[in-house]
Amino acid sequence: MRTGVIMKKSHKDKIVVVGAGNVGEAIAYTLMVRVQANDIVLVDVNEDRAKGAALDIAHGTSFFKQVWVRQGGYEECADAQMIIITAGIARKPGQTRLDLAKTNVSIVKSITENIMKYAKNPLILVVSNPADITTMAVQQVSGLPAERVIGSGTSLDTARFRYILSEKL
């Protein structure tokens, strides 16, 4: 299914976002607004969620030239300039960080196996939590060198901390 508007077809970049939840949708929207790629593909185990998110974002593409937002599958990773993994479950009340890590590591390992079926030497950005552990899992499963697997690290925690401090000061 193709969604979005292309005003002029020229291949700049394709970015695949795996995980069409709140974080994945926000990242795809930001990529569209900043025109970081002219082909943004959302991949999710829940294809309807990915289609809906792609449509929501694509409705704004008429304000930005050369941006195409759509839902797709892992085969889209074959020629992507970057793959961003945002998939994973959110931490539930009472759930330990270790339990979250076990679940999300399992999820990103499966995602990485699917990515590597199609992509030869991808650049992967891991945003799933806990970021350091999931990034290491992606690197181990993919066999990619460290410079091809980038984790968001504690950037989100730092941003949250800065926000809380600004509210208190």
What do the PLM-derived regions correspond to, one by one?
Residues 2-13:
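A short, basic/flexible loop-to-alpha-helix module at the beginning of a structural domain
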Residues 43-81, 95:
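Conserved N-terminal Rossmann-fold NAD(P) cofactor-binding segment
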Residues 31:
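Aromatic pocket-lining residues of Rossmann-like dinucleotide-binding sites
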Residues 87, 126-169:
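Rossmann-fold dinucleotide-binding core
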Residues 94-145:
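Rossmann-fold NAD(P)-binding glycine/threonine-rich loop
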Residues 20-21:
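Glycine-rich Rossmann-fold phosphate-binding loop(s) that bind the pyrophosphate
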